[in-house]
């Protein structure tokens, strides 16, 4: 007659342990101190500083086929369903274990608000070969092993879900940061477009006025155009390409009108000069005729 006992960790302080215990054999529970007490799935030694070297004992009673546990003067105590079995450094009376009980060895050690050393916390499952406890449904060893395999798969799936959830949160944070960056870039682009439109409207009246200048104000327009070409607006990064093209067109028109003005001035000057030359030719016969009349009248007197 034997029993299979399984300890499933509740706080990741150890790996699942499963061992077969025989009647009238005492199994020691304690802290890992040497090679002989190295933790394994088939013993009850743990790599935890909150356990004593000899912390507790566990055995199967051959008469009742019940599993019992007791504390053997541990410093941090043994707890069954959150009930301490004995005071510090004092042995306890045997305590019967049932499937589903929660067993804690030691207590959590804190440094301010942080856990420095974890207690060993486990849920107990017990199956006796050929018999079952009245507190649990009957199940064979094969079904117990199958259930344990299913539990391990569930734990693995849960850990995987936690990792996926963390990755999803990280991805959502990344998307939010990218969205903020795009919004900032869009706002900057809109602001630049508004500035370009503002400066284009501001400069258009001046450029339009230069497109068809009059001869009377040609020199004044030339001076204003020179000042405008050297103003900060001409080198402003907000002036659009269309505005620059319009300015070039106005400049070309201005040069054309200047050429026309100079041509007209040259023609006028040429006509004045021709008149000055010809007026003497026009007036000479007139004076000759007048002189002839005067002489003729004097002769007949």
Curated annotation (Swiss-Prot):
It comes from the Eukaryota. The keyword Phosphoprotein applies. It comes from Schizosaccharomyces pombe (strain 972 / ATCC 24843) (Fission yeast). Keywords: Nucleus, Phosphoprotein. One of its GO terms (biological process) is negative regulation of septation initiation signaling. Interacts with sad1. This is Uncharacterized protein C3H7.13. The modification Phosphoserine is found at residues 204, 231. Residues 187-236 are annotated as: Disordered. Transmembrane segments: none annotated. The keyword Ligase does not apply. GO terms for cellular component: cell division site; cell tip; cytosol; FAR/SIN/STRIPAK complex; mitotic spindle pole body; nucleus. InterPro entries: Cent_Immune-Sig_Mod, FHA_dom, SMAD_FHA_dom_sf. Residues 216-226 have a biased composition (Basic and acidic residues). One of its GO terms (molecular function) is spindle pole body anchor activity. PANTHER family: CENTROSOMAL PROTEIN OF 170 KDA (PTHR15715), LD47843P (PTHR15715:SF37). Residues 27-85 form the FHA domain. It is found in: Nucleus.
């Amino acid at each position: 007659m034997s029993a299979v006992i399984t300890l499933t960790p509740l706080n990741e302080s150890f790996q699942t342990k499963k061992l077969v215990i025989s009647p009238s054999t005492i199994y020691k529970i304690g802290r890992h101190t040497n090679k002989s007490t190295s933790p394994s799935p088939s013993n009850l030694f743990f790599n935890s500083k909150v356990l004593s070297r000899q912390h507790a004992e566990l055995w199967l009673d051959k008469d009742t086929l019940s599993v019992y546990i007791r504390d053997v003067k541990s410093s941090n105590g043994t707890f069954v369903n959150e009930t301490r079995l004995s005071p510090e450094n004092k042995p306890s009376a045997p305590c019967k274990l049932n499937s589903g009980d929660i067993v804690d060895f030691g207590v959590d050690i804190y440094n301010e608000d942080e856990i420095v050393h974890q207690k060993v916390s486990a849920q107990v499952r017990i199956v006796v070969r050929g018999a079952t406890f009245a507190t649990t449904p009957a199940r064979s060893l094969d079904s117990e092993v199958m259930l344990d395999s299913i539990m391990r798969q569930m734990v693995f799936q849960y850990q995987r879900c936690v990792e996926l959830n963390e990755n999803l949160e990280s991805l959502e944070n990344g998307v939010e940061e990218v969205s903020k960056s795009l919004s900032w870039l869009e706002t900057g682009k809109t602001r630049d477009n508004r500035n370009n439109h503002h400066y284009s409207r501001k400069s258009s009246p001046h450029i339009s006025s230069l497109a068809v200048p009059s001869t009377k104000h040609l020199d004044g327009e030339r001076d204003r155009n020179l000042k405008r070409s050297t103003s900060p607006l001409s080198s402003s990064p907000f002036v659009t390409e269309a505005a620059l093209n319009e300015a070039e067109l106005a400049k070309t028109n201005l040069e054309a009108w200047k050429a026309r003005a100079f041509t007209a001035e040259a023609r006028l000057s040429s006509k004045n000069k021709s008149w000055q030359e010809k007026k003497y030719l026009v007036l000479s016969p007139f004076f000759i005729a007048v002189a002839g009349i005067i002489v003729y009248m004097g002769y007949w007197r």
